[in-house]
Design a protein with these regions (language model features):
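Amphipathic terminal alpha-helices
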Residues: 39, 339-350
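Mid/C-terminal beta-alpha module of Rossmann-like enzyme folds, strongest
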Residues: 45, 259, 263-313, 346-349
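N-terminal Rossmann NAD(P)H-binding glycine-rich loop of SDR-like oxidoreductase domains
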Residues: 49-71
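NAD(P)H-binding glycine-rich loop region in Rossmannoid oxidoreductase-like domains
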Residues: 84, 91-145
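Conserved Rossmann-fold NAD(P)-dependent oxidoreductase catalytic core, especially the SDR/UDP-sugar
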Residues: 130, 144-188
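Conserved beta-loop-beta element that borders a ligand/cofactor-binding pocket
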Residues: 166, 199-221
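Glycine/proline-rich active-site loop of Rossmann-fold NAD(P)-dependent oxidoreductases
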Residues: 207, 219-228, 263-273
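A conserved pocket-lining segment of Rossmann-fold NAD(P)-dependent short-chain dehydrogenase/reductase
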Residues: 228-255, 259
Length: 350
């Protein structure tokens, strides 16, 4: 399985249509998006940035790189497979983008304005002990490497900001609790992963502004959670997973990209920031709204036992959600474009 930029511990399984990260994208789709970037030491709002990005070929990363490139910022794609990155970001469509394999990361990070860390193995299969270890280590390994390179950079060419993705899995799961940035961490495996992921990012040099964005389920047209849901609904086979009463803390792709972009440029954005929309919903409501937008019923739930048979321990994350609020983003005045899932789905499907 590949390293990808969804980093929000995103699910991908055919039996789990509502929580999916695409295994691949078409060349045409890939050329529209991007995922690894570098920032300069200028004020990002009015000047050119140099942004280094890990996880650049993922769902969020591709769109983020596209945005940065369109705004004439310099982007460094930090990858473990140069050939794969070059396929997704061909030079003729993305002139000026630098693609760097791991031995070249040091030169890319030094002199960058900022670094965005979106790398991590998708949690998209039955959890064996080996898979669980890799889910954690894929995140810790890349984050530790990036932090080491930032810290070793001379002061005058050290990045000024480090934006590291994490996930709402930090809070654990609950049908009754409401979580914000001040809430304690949960006690399950994914909460443990997120705690170690975040603590690794926080080892960065004290002079670097750090933002940890706990990302929810990202909704967009060309990937993420809707990639499997939409085809299933079009076949009149859509419905919630399990009871449907579990909370679904979502965010539109455009909003999460804008939040990361704003975090790069705005010094007020630091510490933990929840990357979720202001109005989370129960999974059954999401499915009802999706069915309505597509003119299809939401009537065929996937039973608990089927998910547990396929995903084992990992089914807990699908069957038990969490209600997470973006308290810090709202305090900072971040302008969510899509606060309600109905509006988000209509925009995606229009």
């Amino acid at each position: 399985m590949e390293m990808c930029g969804a980093t929000a511990l995103t699910w991908s399984h055919t039996i789990c249509p509502s929580l999916h990260l695409p295994r691949s994208v078409s060349t045409r789709e890939a050329r529209r998006s991007f995922s690894v970037w570098c920032v300069s030491d200028q004020d990002p709002k009015g000047n050119k940035m140099i942004i280094s990005v890990t996880g650049a070929t993922g769902f969020i990363g591709r769109r983020l790189v596209q945005r940065l490139h369109a705004d004439n910022h310099s982007v460094h794609v930090l990858t473990r497979s140069k050939s794969n990155a070059e396929t997704i970001f061909p030079a003729k469509d993305f002139p000026g983008i630098k693609i760097a394999e791991e031995p070249e990361w040091k030169d890319s990070i030094q002199g960058s304005t900022g670094v965005v860390n979106l790398a991590g193995l998708p949690i998209s299969t039955r959890w064996s002990p080996e898979i669980k270890k890799e889910i954690k280590q894929s995140r810790i390994r890349v984050t530790s490497k990036v932090v080491e390179l930032i810290n070793s950079a001379p002061d005058d060419i050290r990045p000024k900001v480090f934006v590291s993705a994490t996930a709402v899995g930090y809070y654990g799961t609950s049908e009754t609790q409401v979580f914000d940035e001040q809430s304690p961490s949960g006690k399950d495996y994914l909460a443990e992963v997120c705690r170690e992921w975040e603590s690794t990012a926080l080892k960065v040099n004290g002079g670097v502004r750090v933002a940890l964005i706990r990302i929810g389920v990202v909704l967009g047209k060309d990937g993420g959670a809707l990639a499997k849901m939409i085809p299933m609904f079009k076949l009149f086979a859509g419905g919630p997973l399990g009871s449907g009463t579990q909370w679904f803390s979502w965010i539109h792709l455009e909003d999460i990209v804008n939040l990361i972009y704003e975090t790069l440029s705005n010094p007020s954005y630091k510490g933990v920031i929840n990357g979720t929309a202001p109005n989370p919903v129960r999974l059954a409501e999401l499915c009802d709204q999706l069915g309505h937008a597509l003119g299809r019923p939401s009537w065929l739930p996937v039973p608990d036992f089927a998910l547990k048979a396929v995903l084992g321990e990992g089914a807990t994350v699908v069957l038990e959600g969490q209600k997470v609020l973006p308290t810090q983003a709202k305090k900072l005045g971040f302008p969510f474009k899509y606060s309600y899932v109905k509006d988000a789905l209509q925009a995606i499907l229009s």
